[in-house]
């Protein structure tokens, strides 16, 4: 399962940061920390839903209680690692003022990266970019953390939303080879890499060896038994 995968990846590669994903639950964080025991560079990625829909129907909770749980999870993860990422699940449908409160609280608790997921793939690019910009302008201490994009492709907007996030201040993007992911998939690594390479005016260097994109795409497709559509962009 995921636990053994993280262990084996940690043993096999030493240069990248290896990140283990958890819910904002102490026992989950304990397991994530154990899975990272062989990693040279460790990160725990914990989080909780922040939209009113998630708060009411998934957690039967309140906005204030969600902030408390978020802060507690980050502080608990910091017992194990210095590098802690927090995700605000369904941030795409979370009201901006409340989202800013959550982000500010988890940064104060020690989060080094804050992930702003468009969990349902609902946002338009202008809307998602404006959300990132709002956080950049309204969160005290935003300079102490990196904002990350995490976009789903349910409406075919994942790559556009990710680029919009970058243009408005995000400095980490969560992407997948060939855009693989649940439902309609996640943001395509190869699309973002080539957009940033071709549009020099954005002035962001990913340090990706783009000559390796095509063979990597084919390898992932073969290993996962997921054919790439013939007219897929880039690959």
Tell me what each language-model feature is.
Residues 15, 118-119, 174-182, 197-206:
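Short beta-alpha connecting loops at secondary-structure transitions
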Residues 196, 200-235:
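A mid-to-C-terminal "edge-of-domain" accessory segment
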Residues 21, 87-89, 117, 150-152, ...:
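Structural motif
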Residues 19-20, 145-151, 168-177:
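A short, small-residue-rich loop immediately preceding and capping a beta-strand
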Residues 4-13, 26-147, 163-170:
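Alpha/beta enzyme core
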Residues 40-41, 157-173, 180-198:
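Flexible glycine/proline-rich, aromatic-decorated loop/lid segments
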Residues 13-23:
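Active-site cofactor/substrate anionic-group-binding motifs, chiefly glycine-
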Residues 2, 28, 154-160:
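Short glycine/serine/threonine-rich phosphate/pyrophosphate-binding segments
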């Amino acid at each position: 399962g995921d636990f053994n995968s993280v262990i084996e990846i940690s043993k096999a590669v030493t240069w990248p940061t290896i990140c283990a994903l958890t819910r904002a639950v102490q026992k989950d964080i304990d397991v994530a920390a154990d899975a990272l025991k062989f990693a040279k560079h460790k990160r725990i990625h914990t989080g909780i839903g922040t939209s009113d829909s998630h708060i009411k129907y998934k957690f039967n909770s309140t906005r204030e209680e969600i902030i408390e749980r978020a802060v507690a999870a980050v502080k608990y993860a910091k017992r194990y690692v210095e590098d802690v990422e927090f995700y605000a699940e369904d941030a795409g449908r979370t009201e901006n003022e409340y989202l800013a409160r959550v982000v500010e609280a988890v940064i104060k608790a020690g989060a080094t990266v804050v992930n702003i997921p468009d969990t349902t793939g609902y946002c338009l690019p202008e809307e998602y970019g404006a959300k990132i910009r709002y956080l950049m302008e309204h969160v005290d201490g935003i300079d102490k953390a990196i904002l990350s994009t995490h976009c789903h492709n349910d409406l075919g907007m994942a790559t556009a939303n990710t680029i919009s996030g970058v243009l408005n201040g995000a400095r980490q993007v969560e992407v997948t080879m060939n855009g693989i992911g649940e439902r309609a998939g996640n943001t395509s690594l190869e699309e973002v890499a080539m957009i940033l390479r071709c549009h020099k005016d954005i002035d962001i260097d990913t340090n990706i060896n783009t000559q390796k994109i095509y063979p990597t795409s084919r390898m992932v497709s073969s290993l996962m038994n997921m054919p790439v559509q013939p007219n897929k962009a880039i690959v």
